[in-house]
Amino acid sequence: MKNYYLVDEKRKTPVSTWEKISQTFRRSVKLELFVGLFVMMRELLKRNNSATIKYPFEKVKLDNRYRAVHRLMRFIESENERCIGCGLCEKICISNCIRMETSLDENGRKKVGNYSINLGRCIYCGFCAEVCPELAIVHGTEYENAAEQRSYFGYKQDFLTPIDKLKNQVEFEGAGSLRKDADLLVVKTPNYYDVMIERALENQDTQEQGENK
């Protein structure tokens, strides 16, 4: 068995009432107490040294990787929805709070008819944004989503970027987005080199034809 010992063997455990009162008094008038009071008063009397902000008139600037209420993105050029209805976000959701209904349009392409997220159940883990192949669902910076009901659902029209505000849509840089040097990290396949050789030969032929003329 191990031999246990006290950290301070010289200190005796108070037994009588007077010893307990004496121990409490000694601990109360130690130097550490006055040091803490001095630091508190010094910070209190400083000007323009407030540790708080005047919410809601002032708000903390959020980082790009902050995970708040979701957003559904559009393509700026065509104004079409990025979501292809693959259902990966619904399958990977560990809170089981995403529901998606898809159907086929007149061209035989899959379209998303209904899309809902139970914001009261969501834990904002970011898995849905990371698994999305089209960067269609991302996390925004809207965190003021208090509701009176426990099950608070957000629907497709609540998350999707309106067309009139599409010009103000900013690409998401948080969870699920590509790195700025993503192109440099892509491993080039043999087909890439074949294409580059063909392009070089075509450029060479074009230059030779121009010189012959």
UniProtKB/Swiss-Prot annotation:
InterPro entries (UniProt xref): 4Fe4S_Fe-S-bd, 4Fe4S_Fe_S_CS, NADH_quinone_OxRdtase_chainI
Keyword DNA damage found: no
Ranges annotated as spanning the membrane: none
Enzyme class: translocase
Keyword set includes Iron: yes
Database matches in Gene3D superfamilies: 3.30.70.3270
GO annotation (BP), single: aerobic respiration
Protein name: NADH-quinone oxidoreductase subunit I
E.C. designation(s): 7.1.1.-
Manner of cofactor binding, per the entry note: Binds 2 [4Fe-4S] clusters per subunit.
GO MF annotation list: 4 iron, 4 sulfur cluster binding; iron ion binding; NADH:ubiquinone reductase (non-electrogenic) activity; quinone binding
Function: NDH-1 shuttles electrons from NADH, via FMN and iron-sulfur (Fe-S) centers, to quinones in the respiratory chain. The immediate electron acceptor for the enzyme in this species is believed to be ubiquinone. Couples the redox reaction to proton translocation (for every two electrons transferred, four hydrogen ions are translocated across the cytoplasmic membrane), and thus conserves the redox energy in a proton gradient.
Top-level taxon of the source organism: Bacteria
Database matches in Pfam families: Fer4_7
Keywords noted in UniProt: 4Fe-4S, Cell inner membrane, Cell membrane, Iron, Iron-sulfur, Membrane, Metal-binding, NAD, Quinone, Repeat, Translocase, Ubiquinone
Binding annotation for [4Fe-4S] cluster 1: C83, C86, C89, C132
Source taxonomy: Bacteria, Pseudomonadati, Campylobacterota, Epsilonproteobacteria, Campylobacterales
Membrane topology: Peripheral membrane protein
Location within or outside the cell: Cell inner membrane
Family listed: Belongs to the complex I 23 kDa subunit family.
Signal peptide region: none
Catalytic activity: a quinone + NADH + 5 H(+)(in) = a quinol + NAD(+) + 4 H(+)(out)
Names of required cofactors: [4Fe-4S] cluster
Species this chain originates from: Campylobacter jejuni subsp. jejuni serotype O:6 (strain 81116 / NCTC 11828)
Subunit structure: NDH-1 is composed of 14 different subunits. Subunits NuoA, H, J, K, L, M, N constitute the membrane sector of the complex.
